[in-house]
Amino acid sequence: MLKQITLYTDGSCLGNPGPGGYAAVLIYKQHRKELAQGYELTTNNRMELMAAIAGLQSLSEPCQVRLTTDSQYVRQGITQWIHGWKKKGWKTANREPVKNVDLWLLLDSEIQRHDVEWFWVKGHSGHPENERCDELARNAALADSRLIDSGYPS
């Protein structure tokens, strides 16, 4: 039986594009793990994707994951839009290249390892774990230890 993990994610970008950060909060029984990282120049959508990727990558074995995000872009992208993008060779309905394809490929790879159920929560609506992720992501975006987002612009 797979371990049941609850994962909350959020991304932040100050300027969009600008300095950004992501955060993930993972909960397994009484255990809690918080992840966050900042980047020098990125976008909000990239940070939302990175949050989900980082959370899933941090799991050392396949798990049953209840992933909650405040990003409709991430939730709809991975549950609906990705199927059409793959069929069209990573092009949109308008035949434009899919933005952030490097991260969509990573996220698609990660969800193959896990049984992921996707949930959406309205951002800044008082949900405690989403608010915590927002705080961690903003702090990461402001931190001195920001990395370079090698995929931006993609």
UniProtKB/Swiss-Prot annotation:
Residues 1-142 form the RNase H type-1 domain. Mg(2+) 2 binds at residues 10, 134. It catalyses: Endonucleolytic cleavage to 5'-phosphomonoester. GO terms for molecular function: magnesium ion binding; nucleic acid binding; RNA-DNA hybrid ribonuclease activity. Its EC number is 3.1.26.4. PANTHER family: RIBONUCLEASE H1. Endonuclease that specifically degrades the RNA of RNA-DNA hybrids. This is Ribonuclease H. The lineage of its organism: Bacteria, Pseudomonadati, Pseudomonadota, Gammaproteobacteria, Aeromonadales.
